[in-house]
């Protein structure tokens, strides 16, 4: 039980409370309203999770056009002005769907960062995001939650939550 839900093999030596100079982290939990009945939204969420976990055919594509998370994200980007936002989600397919759905809603300079890009293209997109006048939003698949640090980003959006708590820590640790 401890290995599954506790720190297990992860040791937390350098926590924010033990080190100085880090800004305080504030979690913003946002309940989202949906046009559909709760049962319809629940079915959509279950299908999305099944697809993310590889339980459904790759033929089924995400359709996030009317997803309340996209509506909220568009509003958030408008409210934040020029602040840099890092968004992390589970899969390449979801990254591309978020990019398409968001482009229909709000004009924003957004880069993508996922497994199907070459290493050079990922580096270019990360560099564009790092530039002062570059992308305001970087939409990453799970590959963006490991290895790279985006400390210059002002906000982190977790479009979905990983089932593994260590992966959640990895995502949060990008900023």
Where are these regions (language model features)?
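Conserved SF2 helicase motif VI
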Residues: 164-175
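Conserved helicase motor "Helicase C" RecA-like lobe of SF1/SF2 P-loop NTPases
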Residues: 89-114
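Conserved helicase core region in the C-terminal RecA-like lobe
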Residues: 93, 137-144, 161-163
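Phosphate- and divalent-cation-binding pockets in alpha/beta enzyme and binding domains
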Residues: 94-98, 149, 167
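Conserved helicase ATPase core of P-loop NTP-dependent helicases/translocases
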Residues: 108-142
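Inter-lobe coupling linker of SF2 helicases/translocases
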Residues: 1-56, 68, 75, 80-82
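A short beta-strand element within the Helicase C-terminal
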Residues: 148-161
